[in-house]
Amino acid sequence: MIPLKLSGVTRILCLGAHSDDIEIGCGGTVLGLIESSDRIEFYWMVLSSNPERAKEAELSARAFLRRARTKTIVVKSFRDGFLPYIGTPVKECFEELKKAFVPDVIFTPSRHDLHQDHRFVCELTWNTFRNHLILEYEIPKYDGDLRSPNFFVPLSEAICRSKVNKLMRYFGSQRNKQWFSEDLFHGFMRLRGVEASSPTCYAEAFHCRKMLLDCHR
């Protein structure tokens, strides 16, 4: 594997359809980026919630971004499961976001995710941000829609533990779900670590469909 450092990144946009999407998909990467740099500004947006899930999303986002230099956390209240079917106000939300924040890197769900909300958020991400590095994260679930990612971020064991501990602590509404468990989250990062030949044994993985390599000084 040839490593690539994102040393010039200072503005990161994290997008999730649901309150725990970002944490599951790229929570370890977020923690690692904050650990490596105190210059990064985060904009964290969750699109759907109810009062219980909104509280979880807010508390979790604050925990993950606690050491970030600057952070903006936005939790919307669109109806879970219906994002593509109420598309106009969601699209308007993205248009407002484009004016409010200009990111260097965007984390968003995968285009191939079979959950309609995840897929729609990805579609709007690409429609709205056309000159940005977009990394599509993975969410393991019943649908069996995981593919072969092509972009990996090695994670230390300590960061993996921190990610999983925060997930289990802040998302009490999900603890009774069969897929929401410590062993799944740890095991998934361990699997991607093997695929990435990660020196730390763990990694998160993403789909990167377009990247511009600047060879000029």
Regions found by a protein language model. Give the residues of each.
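Short, solvent-exposed loop/turn segments enriched in Ser/Thr/Gly
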Residues: 206-207
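Active-site beta-strand->loop->alpha-helix modules in alpha/beta enzyme cores, enriched
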Residues: 1-19, 23-141, 147, 169, ...
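Hydrophobic/aromatic residues within well-ordered alpha-helical segments
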Residues: 53, 156-159
